C-alpha cells in the first residue's frame, strides 16, 4: 500500500462528457465485440439482482485492506457525480458497504458500485435503484482502520482499472475501456451496434450458416 500522504488522489484524468454519454447508450455486448478479452471482467463480478440498470461512467478506483472498508467510505464523499466507484476489496468475507453508504453515494450522484468483494443490505439498494455489482453479499461489516488507496490503478474482476477509464456494466457483464482508447472504441462499438440493428434474423441466419459450413468444410468435417 502507498504511504498515507500519497494514498488519496483526487486530480485524475477524465473522459469527455460526450464520450461518456455515448457509452451510456451501448450494451456491454456491443463493446465487448470490439475490445480485447482483457477488458472484460470475470463473471464472478456480477449484478446483485436481475434487470439491474446499466451504468457507464469514469472509474473512481478504490483499494481496501483485508477486512476493511475505510477507503470506500471515504470515496463516496470524493467521487464526482456520474463516477462509477470500482473497488479492489481486501477479501470477500466482510462487506465493504451497506445500505446507508450506498444511499449516500446515490444521493451524491455516484452511478453505482463495482466491487471485487462483497456488500450487504442489498434489498435497500435494490429498492432505491442503486446498481451494485460484486462477488456476492455478506451480513458482516468490515472495519474502518485502513490502509488503502483512492485513485490508484487496481485489479477488479481480473482487469486492471485506472482512474478515469470508462466502465460499462449491465446484466450481461462489465467492460473496462482504457481512457486513451475510449473515443476509438466508442466509434467502433456504435458502428457495430448500428449494423447489427439493421440486420434481420433471416439475413443473419443465412450469413451465419454460410460461415459455419465454410469453416466445417475447411477443417475437413463431413456432414
Positions of PLM-derived features:
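Feature captures the catalytic cores and cofactor-binding loops of soluble hydro-lyases/lyases
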Residues: 2-163, 177-223
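Channel- or pocket-lining gating/hinge segments that regulate access to a cavity or pore
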Residues: 173-175
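C-terminal binding/interaction regions
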Residues: 167
